[in-house]
Amino acid sequence: MKFSLILTLFLVLMVGCESSEKKTKSKSDNIRKVQNFHGKSNIKLTQTILDSILPGDIVLRRGDGPLSFHLSNTTKEVFTHCGIIVKENQQLKVIHSLGGQVSKQEIDGVQLSSLTHFVNYASDSLLYICRPIFVDSANYKVAKEAYKYLEKKIPFDHRFSMLSKDKFYCSELLYYVFKNINNQKNIFTIKKKHRAYMLLFSTFFNTNNFTKIYAIQPKIKY
C-alpha cells in the first residue's frame, strides 16, 4: 500500500514536470520569435534630415513588441506603427495612439512623444517618413487635426474596429485625420480579413498622395 502510494506520487510528479517543461519550451520559443523580431533602434537622424521634416509629416516604424510581431504576420507588411509629426518649442514630436500595456509612457491611447523617443523603438531600425500631398496645405491641416484628438484624450482601440470613433488604434487615428481634412473621402488602402478590415501601411507608398522624405526599409514592392 505504501509502495503503491509512493509510485503514484512519483508518476504524478514526472507528468507534471514534463508538462511544465513543454509549457516552458513553448513559451521560450514564442519569446525567441519575438526577440528575433525586435530590438532597440540604432537610427540617428542627422540635422539635415531633421531640418527637412515639417509638422504634419507621417512617420512609420516597425514596432518592438509582441503585438507588432503578430500584426506584421497578419498584414504581411514591414511597418506596424505610425504617427503624425508635430513641433512644440522647436522640438519635433509625434502624436500617435498606443496601448497602455506597450506604451513606454503608460498612456492608453492618443499620446505625445518626442520624435527621438519614437525612433528609438523602431524595431530592426526600420523607419519611413513621408509628406501628405493629397490636399492643399495638407501638412498644416494634418497637424492641426491630430492635436484635436490629442486634446480629447482618445483611448486606444483594443478591438481594432474601424466602426467606432471614440477609440483609435495607430493607423485608425490617421484614417480619421485624413478623412476630416479630405471632405470625408478615404485615401487608405483597406483589406478585409476574417470579417475585419485592416488599414494597410502600403497607403503611404502611394506617390499620388505622399512624398518620401526619409527611409530605412528593405526593398519591398507594394
Regions found by a protein language model. Give the residues of each.
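Sec-dependent signal peptide recognition
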Residues: 2-8
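C-terminal motif of bacterial Sec signal peptides marking the signal peptidase cleavage site
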Residues: 14-16
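N-terminal accessory segments that precede or flank the first globular/catalytic domain
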Residues: 18-88
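Activation targets extended, charge/polar-rich intrinsically disordered C-terminal tails
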Residues: 18-25, 158-222
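Glycine-rich catalytic cores of cysteine/serine-nucleophile enzymes that process amide/ester linkages
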Residues: 61-127, 155-168
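Active-site nucleophile-His-acid catalytic modules used for acyl/amide transfer and hydrolysis
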Residues: 67-68, 124-189
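Residue-level detector of flexible, active-site-proximal loop/helix-junction positions
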Residues: 101, 136, 194
